[in-house]
Amino acid sequence: MNFKKLPKIELHCHLDGSLRIDTILDIAKKDNIPLPSYNKKELINYVSIMDDCNSLDEYLNKFFIPNKVMQTKENLKRIAFELLEDVAADNVKYIEVRFAPLLHVEKGLNIEEIIESVLAGIKEAEKLYDIKGNLILGCMRNMDIPSAFEVVKKGAKFIGKGVVAIDLCAGEEPHFPGKYIEVLKLAKECGYRITIHAGEAGVGENVLEAINLLNAERIGHGIYIKNCAEAYKLVKEKNIPLEVCPTSNLHTKAFESYETHPFMDFLKDGIKVTINTDNMTVSNTTITKELEMLNKFCGLSIEDYKILYLNAVEASFASPETKEILKSYANEITA
């Protein structure tokens, strides 16, 4: 089955986890940024999971170097443009790129300049390729609460101009949602859609709280609802979409293999799952690769994929007009 030619939608892709290695090297040389190696084959080991990874925290260490080259307007625009260029080549028709603006203030940029630069790269790619992109702003859970309020407030002016949603990301502790009730209340009042990283690192109850306390409309990962009956029931009853990233989940040791990943069980039980990369460079993956792995190890069929694609259309934070266009591509999903 040729998954490459099929239309695709990406709802969970981190900008700083999806840089081209060549771009990291090019910017580092241009801006005199020290790297542990300027040899491409050696540098890959610092930014990608090549063989093994022991935990989510170890996985997150791979973002240190990419963020060093994402501190100027020019570089942010270029990296956003290249991401859309790369996924368009994989026949992705719509992507929601997520990133945390406060990771890019090291050289004095303010939040507005950072968001503007990424949006400029997205819009430039839209002009050249058959793709539409929107932006999700991330609040880092390892930063303080005032910083989350700052992102929500300063990003609000871009709602309707390419920014569609707010997210909470980084390492996951039990019962984190309770800390962010007021932040997400403000986000909802501002007009942001809400997606929350939860249930990625072993705590299914976090999904329950993200929905009940934070009004999450979508859940990033969410795979550990399998260990929390109450969360599973709520996700199914409320038809909450899960942004599932199988290869990333293997890398963070959430699961040992594709065969033991609950993705297909969720799909067969009517949970609204979508398929995503999480981080194309860190996990050395594409949507096509994700589909090929699920086909090879879990028996994903073309009929299954059509359900996944339409799930992603419905779950997206795209405009009604864009959703209609995306729905029309479903006719191309044939073996």
UniProtKB/Swiss-Prot annotation:
What is catalysed by this protein? adenosine + H2O + H(+) = inosine + NH4(+); 2'-deoxyadenosine + H2O + H(+) = 2'-deoxyinosine + NH4(+)
Task: Site Important for catalytic activity: give positions.
Answer: 221
**Cofactor binding annotation:** Binds 1 zinc ion per subunit.
Which cofactors does this gene product need?
Answer: Zn(2+)
Keyword Hydrolase among record annotations: yes
Q: Which residues does the record give as Zn(2+) binding sites?
A: 12, 14, 197, 278
Active site per the UniProt annotation: 200 (proton donor)
- Which cysteines are cross-linked by disulfides? none
Gene Ontology CC, one term: cytosol
Output the Gene Ontology terms for molecular function.
Answer: 2'-deoxyadenosine deaminase activity; adenosine deaminase activity; zinc ion binding
What keywords tag this UniProt record? Hydrolase, Metal-binding, Nucleotide metabolism, Zinc
Tree of life domain: Bacteria
The protein's Enzyme Commission number: 3.5.4.4
A Pfam family cross-referenced in the UniProt record is: A_deaminase
Tell me the InterPro entries matching this sequence. A_deaminase, A_deaminase_dom, Ado/ade_deaminase, Metal_Hydrolase
Q: Does the keyword Hydrolase apply?
A: yes
Question: Which SUPFAM superfamilies does this chain map to?
Answer: Metallo-dependent hydrolases (SSF51556)
Annotated substrate binding lies at 14, 16
The family classification in the record reads: Belongs to the metallo-dependent hydrolases superfamily. Adenosine and AMP deaminases family. Adenosine deaminase subfamily.
Function text: Catalyzes the hydrolytic deamination of adenosine and 2-deoxyadenosine.
Task: Tell me what this protein is called.
Answer: Adenosine deaminase
Q: Which organism is it from?
A: Clostridium botulinum (strain Hall / ATCC 3502 / NCTC 13319 / Type A)
